[in-house]
């Protein structure tokens, strides 16, 4: 019976992969040259003009790309906005995404996807524990699910994992995930899909973080793209007052594409005017930045929404019309935008206690995960799996003592601009996101509890005991003399 189920999973995966490759052939993949994105067919410079898209909130376990009715409702609205890219924070890798991905492709919209979920991510409390084979199985299964879609622009290995000076040690494990993802993509013979990191704009370590993820002699361990969550331009600001001029200097020698993975300060009296669009898509910034994504599509509790959703009804807010107007009137720079062809990667920052505590020697990939490189990740486990459950459990006491930390890094941190300081005097408070804050711990705990209700005996095994299917999968394969 189990073998029959696993065989069925193989057939389903093959069918979805075939649907993916046949549905997106008309969408040219995006490739990287120097520090810029380019259309692989036309050769034109590609600038991200997008929005962050996660109806229900970015720490929600709901997958917006697995519900055909949601995509039928929202994609025409996204098309009307004039965008070419969406960023999605959480997906269920066990679901069928072919309808939504095809609809996005038909409307010229690319996807940047975070591979983590609120219950499967690198834990800030114990990154070493959460970096385990079961976590990587979930990451690799997400890659398997989406890699055949040409309109997947890239994957984020982490989002705002480093949200304070005290969490810089987690960078070591996120960088290991970058390495593992890039090696997995190569081993599975997928096209060269960019893998990056989305950073909080924290003055104390933003330069160190950028350098760290782009340093070292091992190319697979260096990111392909760097996203910055930046809320420094508020209202009718300017290139200098907002601090954008400082960011230009900071990243001017960066060898991979840099873009704003979240932007759109809402600390304004009424609606957001989005005057920063004129700067972002100008020759003043195009030599370094490749566009950005506005936070966010749907209006949630933090009031950053462009639209209000009520069932199947979408109401466009004033912010939507303002952004649409800015996108429509501001063209991309002509030619290649002055991009750099330099491939000089950064020098690794030195370890310094209390300042930068990331190690330049990365941990070896968990040995149990090596089988996935030849066989694939196996059956996707979806959002019901909690790969950091044992890590969170042993840190319960720490959670009670530290209200400001978040327990995972799957989406954005609960207060992006509070942690992401800038030269601008304003402070933004982006309240929902992928790395649940202490106030959101109950969501993560509930999901973990639901997952473990029938697996209470696994706790003694550590994180490796949480996902059993892949181990059984490998054992059966070996029994039938399959090469893994």
Swiss-Prot record:
Question: Where are glycans found on this sequence?
Answer: 24, 60, 166, 299, 344, 359
What's noted about post-translational modification?
The GPI-anchor is attached to the protein in the endoplasmic reticulum and serves to target the protein to the cell surface. There, the glucosamine-inositol phospholipid moiety is cleaved off and the GPI-modified mannoprotein is covalently attached via its lipidless GPI glycan remnant to the 1,6-beta-glucan of the outer cell wall layer.
Recall the GO molecular function terms of this protein's record: 1,3-beta-glucanosyltransferase activity
Q: Does the keyword Lipoprotein apply?
A: yes
Keywords in UniProt for this one?
A: Cell wall, Cell wall biogenesis/degradation, Disulfide bond, Glycoprotein, GPI-anchor, Lipoprotein, Membrane, Secreted, Signal, Transferase
Membrane topology reported for the UniProt record: Lipid-anchor; GPI-anchor
EC number, as in UniProt = 2.4.1.-
> Where is this chain's protein located in or outside the cell?
Secreted, Cell wall; Membrane
User: Which residues are annotated as active site?
Assistant: 160, 262
Q: Where is the signal peptide?
A: 1-19
Q: Please give the residue ranges the record annotates as the region Disordered.
A: 383-462
- Provide a GO biological process annotation: fungal-type cell wall (1->3)-beta-D-glucan biosynthetic process
Biased-composition ranges for Low complexity? 405-462
Residues that make up the propeptide removed upon maturation: 463-484
What InterPro entries does the database record attribute to this sequence? Glucanosyltransferase, Glycoside_hydrolase_SF
Q: Which GO terms describe its cellular component?
A: endoplasmic reticulum; extracellular region; fungal-type cell wall; side of membrane
Described by its record, this protein's role is as follows:
Splits internally a 1,3-beta-glucan molecule and transfers the newly generated reducing end (the donor) to the non-reducing end of another 1,3-beta-glucan molecule (the acceptor) forming a 1,3-beta linkage, resulting in the elongation of 1,3-beta-glucan chains in the cell wall. Involved in cell wall biosynthesis and morphogenesis.
Name under which the protein is recorded: 1,3-beta-glucanosyltransferase GAS5
Gene name of the encoded protein: GAS5
